[in-house]
């Protein structure tokens, strides 16, 4: 995610994104996001400058731009760009650590023609790991949503439910099956995986008959494996 103020372009956040393995229930939707990215140094060295050149070339002066990449042994390759706010609510994480809120800046720009803040404090190297767990549902009508066991818990930063009791979910393999997102932070990858387990224990979404509606959530073992940690 890049924030742009009066022609100054700043890298605000770099995430690693894990795709859902529920291939029969959804398309390739995002299951889990974590920042800082393990590819941060490689990205800054190889890609960041080129992205800034691109944004300057299109005349970007004020706003927010987001890019998606695939990183593997062949390097880092871009496949999608948006000159807009992305869907992961990254402004909440950036605001927490850097006191910069690009959502408010965009509102300010739409009303006054000025972003209303500077990028002096912008820094994508956050002091903690910050993660987002995405929640998807089977088809049906929601009869119960309970996450009370997570409210106020250490590490839980934000619970954003996009669905409520009575909503009908159509099983069509799109973001229409998304129930919401839970953001959390910790000092280590091991702590992040522990919070994922706790979320699974303390979150309930059922249909009118009391059946579980949650699709299988992100497997924390994938994160440990990617980070080379024995779990």
Which functions belong to the PLM regions below?
Residues 2, 61-73, 118, 214-219:
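A short glycine-rich, hydrophobically flanked beta-strand micro-motif that places a catalytic Asp/Glu
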Residues 2-60, 64, 71, 82-110, ...:
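ATP-dependent carboxylate/phosphate-activation module, predominantly the ATP-grasp catalytic core
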Residues 69, 80-83, 137, 186:
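Active-site proximal loops enriched in glycine and acidic residues that flank catalytic Cys/His/Asp
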Residues 13-16, 80, 137, 163:
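Pocket-edge structural micro-motifs
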Residues 11-13, 80, 158, 181:
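Extracellular/lumenal ectodomain signal focusing on beta-strand-rich modules
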Residues 75-77:
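Conserved protein kinase catalytic/activation segment
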Residues 107-231:
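Peripheral (often C-terminal) accessory segments that flank ATP-dependent C-N-forming ligase machineries
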Residues 1-2, 143:
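PAS-family sensory/regulatory modules and their coupling/dimerization elements
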């Amino acid at each position: 995610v890049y924030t742009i103020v009066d022609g100054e372009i700043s890298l605000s956040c770099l995430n690693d994104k894990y795709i859902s393995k529920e291939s029969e229930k959804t398309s390739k939707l995002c299951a889990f996001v974590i920042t800082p990215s393990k590819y941060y140094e490689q990205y800054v060295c190889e890609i960041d400058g080129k992205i800034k050149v691109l944004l300057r070339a299109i005349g970007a002066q004020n706003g927010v731009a987001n890019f998606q990449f695939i990183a593997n042994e062949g390097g880092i390759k871009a496949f999608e760009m948006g000159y807009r706010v992305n869907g992961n609510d990254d402004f909440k994480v950036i605001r927490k650590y850097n006191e910069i809120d690009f959502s408010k800046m965009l509102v300010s720009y739409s009303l006054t023609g000025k972003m209303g803040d500077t990028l002096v404090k912008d820094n994508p190297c956050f002091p903690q790991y910050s993660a987002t767990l995405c929640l998807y549902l089977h088809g049906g009508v929601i009869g119960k949503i309970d996450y009370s066991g997570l409210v106020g818990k250490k590490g839980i930063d934000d619970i954003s439910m996009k669905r409520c009791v009575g909503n009908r979910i159509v099983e069509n393999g799109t973001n229409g099956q998304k129930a919401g997102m839970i953001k959390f932070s910790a000092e280590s990858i091991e702590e992040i995986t522990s919070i994922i387990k706790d979320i699974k224990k303390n979150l309930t979404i059922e249909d009118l008959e009391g059946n579980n509606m949650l699709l299988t959530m992100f497997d924390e073992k994938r994160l440990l494996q990617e980070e080379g940690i024995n779990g």
